[in-house]
């Protein structure tokens, strides 16, 4: 079998099918018939016969992305090797402060309601929390325990 140059036919078929040349499919069994086609009309006839067809558009699979998203939802892919931004870029210092101070104030209110601390102590601890003295709620509770001794 000799190799035929079907670039003209491919170009004409692409024009008729209104697609790119890469999406034009030729039936391997009818390459001789295709080689004889020289006009767009010849190409149209071959398309009607089903010898020339337009291939479907190739999509890009989202399987890998979906799998990665599922892993992230499970809390994976968060180790040191996966981090790009600085610590402050991933969770801004202000946002961390807001979360911490809200938790501390909630814990303080609860302690006051339960009678663990009186009004005066509550106010002192509230100000200390505002000043950034406590790292966490656990740190605050340790401080209160030591204060009682």
UniProtKB/Swiss-Prot annotation:
Ordered alphabetically, the record's keywords are: Ribonucleoprotein, Ribosomal protein, RNA-binding, rRNA-binding
- Protein origin, superkingdom: Archaea
Stretches the record annotates as Disordered: 67-90
Pfam families named in the record: Ribosomal_L19e (PF01280), Ribosomal_L19e_C (PF25476)
Give the Gene3D superfamilies listed for this entry: 1.10.1200.240, 1.10.1650.10
Q: Determine if Ribosomal protein is one of this entry's keywords.
A: yes
A GO term from the CC aspect: cytosolic large ribosomal subunit
Give me any GO biological process, just one. Answer: translation
**GO terms, molecular function:** large ribosomal subunit rRNA binding; structural constituent of ribosome
> PROSITE patterns, from UniProt?
RIBOSOMAL_L19E
> Does this UniProt record's set of keywords contain Ribosomal protein?
yes
Question: What family does the database annotate?
Answer: Belongs to the eukaryotic ribosomal protein eL19 family.
Q: What does this protein do?
A: Binds to the 23S rRNA.
**Complex formation:** Part of the 50S ribosomal subunit.
What is the recorded name of this protein? Large ribosomal subunit protein eL19
């Amino acid at each position: 079998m000799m190799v035929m140059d079907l670039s003209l036919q491919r170009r004409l078929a692409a024009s008729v099918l209104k697609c790119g040349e890469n999406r034009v499919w030729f039936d391997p069994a009818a390459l001789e018939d295709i080689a004889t086609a020289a006009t767009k009309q010849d190409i149209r006839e071959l398309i009607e016969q089903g010898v020339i067809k337009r291939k479907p558009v190739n999509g890009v699979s989202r399987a890998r992305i979906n799998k990665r998203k599922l892993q992230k939802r499970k809390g994976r892919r968060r180790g040191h090797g996966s981090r790009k931004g600085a610590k402050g870029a991933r969770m801004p210092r202000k946002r961390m402060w807001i979360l911490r101070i809200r938790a501390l104030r909630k814990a303080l209110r609860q302690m006051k309601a339960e009678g663990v601390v009186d009004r005066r102590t509550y106010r002192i601890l509230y100000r200390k929390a505002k000043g950034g003295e406590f790292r966490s709620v656990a740190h605050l509770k340790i401080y209160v325990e030591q204060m009682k001794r």
